[in-house]
Amino acid sequence: MKLLYEGKAKRIYETQNPNEVICEFKDSLTAFNGEKADEESGKGALNCAITTLIFEALEKEGIPTHLIKQIDETKQLVKKVDIILIEVVVRNIVAGSLAKRLGLKEGTKLPFTIVEFYYKNDDLNDPLINDDHAMVLELVKTRKELDLLREYGLKVNKFLSEFFDKVGLTLVDFKIEFGRDENGNIILADEITPDSCRLWDKKTGKKLDKDLFRFNLGNIKEAYTEVLNRLKDVK
């Protein structure tokens, strides 16, 4: 397989179909824009399984994704997309950069869900942007597309909040990415995993996400395995 692209968490390979690629989840762990890095054996397989499970559930809810099927422990066959260079961050509870930026106390429940856009650019440390910035940077074609990203973000949040709640997890916040398929349709891409979500146990408040690695709070593999096992029980 010819390697087309390698990022911090995934490798993308070409297939015989020009509109499909293989996405391989790596065992690498990174935080603080790559300043902190490590490896955790089995982490790629866990994130691949979690993303497959969640994307299949989202498809049933009418939210289009790039997933075609999982083909082995760490690989998915997905639709080839042109990634939109906007990270859509959805927040239900104050945590992370929001607490730091606005001086709000971590753990505070927000009065309503906040949707933020970040410019996907490592050299600039993925800065927070507004709609005007997105248009000036030509990250989207129209403001209606920004509205669609926001709408999808809120739809994903509504579904995932209920999905995780069923297994005793609070969805604090998450990051998602989108791309354009061969027909120009905007669809959900990348992943939804404990790498890209903050998940807290409802009873204990225990973190079951990448903050464990960021701040040396516990074992990533144990936490991600627990998340996957809980999600398998969703009825």
Swiss-Prot record:
Name the source organism.
Nautilia profundicola (strain ATCC BAA-1463 / DSM 18972 / AmH)
- Catalytic reaction list: 5-amino-1-(5-phospho-D-ribosyl)imidazole-4-carboxylate + L-aspartate + ATP = (2S)-2-[5-amino-1-(5-phospho-beta-D-ribosyl)imidazole-4-carboxamido]succinate + ADP + phosphate + 2 H(+)
Q: What is this protein called?
A: Phosphoribosylaminoimidazole-succinocarboxamide synthase
Biological process terms in GO annotation: 'de novo' IMP biosynthetic process; cobalamin biosynthetic process
- First-level EC class: ligase
The pathway is: Purine metabolism; IMP biosynthesis via de novo pathway; 5-amino-1-(5-phospho-D-ribosyl)imidazole-4-carboxamide from 5-amino-1-(5-phospho-D-ribosyl)imidazole-4-carboxylate: step 1/2
Q: What is its EC number?
A: 6.3.2.6
Q: Name one GO molecular function term.
A: ATP binding
> Which gene is transcribed and translated to give this protein?
purC
Q: Name one Pfam family in it.
A: SAICAR_synt
